[in-house]
Curated annotation (Swiss-Prot):
This protein's record includes keyword Iron: no
CDD domains hit by this protein: Tryptophan_synthase_alpha
Superkingdom of origin organism: Bacteria
Annotated source species: Cupriavidus metallidurans (strain ATCC 43123 / DSM 2839 / NBRC 102507 / CH34)
Family per similarity comment: Belongs to the TrpA family.
Protein name in UniProt: Tryptophan synthase alpha chain
Pathway: Amino-acid biosynthesis; L-tryptophan biosynthesis; L-tryptophan from chorismate: step 5/5
Main function: The alpha subunit is responsible for the aldol cleavage of indoleglycerol phosphate to indole and glyceraldehyde 3-phosphate.
GO molecular function terms noted in the UniProt entry: tryptophan synthase activity
Keywords carried by this UniProt record: Amino-acid biosynthesis, Aromatic amino acid biosynthesis, Lyase, Tryptophan biosynthesis
Quaternary structure, from the entry: Tetramer of two alpha and two beta chains.
InterPro entries recorded: Aldolase_TIM, RibuloseP-bd_barrel, Trp_synthase_alpha_AS, Trp_synthase_suA
Gene Ontology cellular component annotations, sorted alphabetically: cytosol
Amino acid sequence: MSRIQKTFAALAAQQKKGLIPFITAGDPAPALTVDLMHALVAGGADVIELGVPFSDPMADGPVIQRASERALAQGVSLTQVLAWVTEFRKTNATTPVVLMGYANPIERMGEETFAKAASAAGVDGVLVVDYPPEECESFAALMRANQMDPIFLLAPTSTDDRIAAVAKVASGYLYYVSLTGVTGSATLDLESVAARLPLIKQHANLPVGVGFGIRDAQTARAIGSVADAVVIGSRLVQLLEDAPREKAVDSLRAFIADIRQALDA
């Protein structure tokens, strides 16, 4: 059982919903990344999604684009991100870490080299936004061969064929994007999410995390009523952009603790 699978099995046994926060590695300051990861866990995160900065993050809205730009301007690379995961693992051997990003940095490093390095660092899952599942069998197999779960996105526009293709290669959990568009945009339509998830479950026997459009404890709780887990990203990245640097860690922990409390209520 992978760390991600163990986490979701424990949540199911406790009848709890998963909380999966996203932050961009290196933002707002490289020196804070590992402390922010620990703050997420202290606040009640079950899985951490760590964004790998990239110069052309086409699926992301302006908030996460700016975070990527800030991190890249400070020299953050994929190698550096893996070093932070290694550092995090020195004092946390249980919380799964999923790298989320784009194909280009992985391909520059080389898929085999990346797979070995990420696994050695203690990465548990990899979500590559611009890898289509239909063309991803060898990459997914490489991840699994290195004890990592390949994680994929599904959207309201995903056809049955696309869902079936994802189900064939995915493990760990599925990330359902509850809105069409870029991260941080639009508002949430709970009814359409509730209607869609059973259709996904018909194809894939995996937990489903729902993200995009979750901004506060209230929306998180609403999504938690229908999904296995709640993914929250743009709102956290915005919080880190707005918070004074010296208060970033405490602000993040407090915000996540509020979400956790709402999910458990």
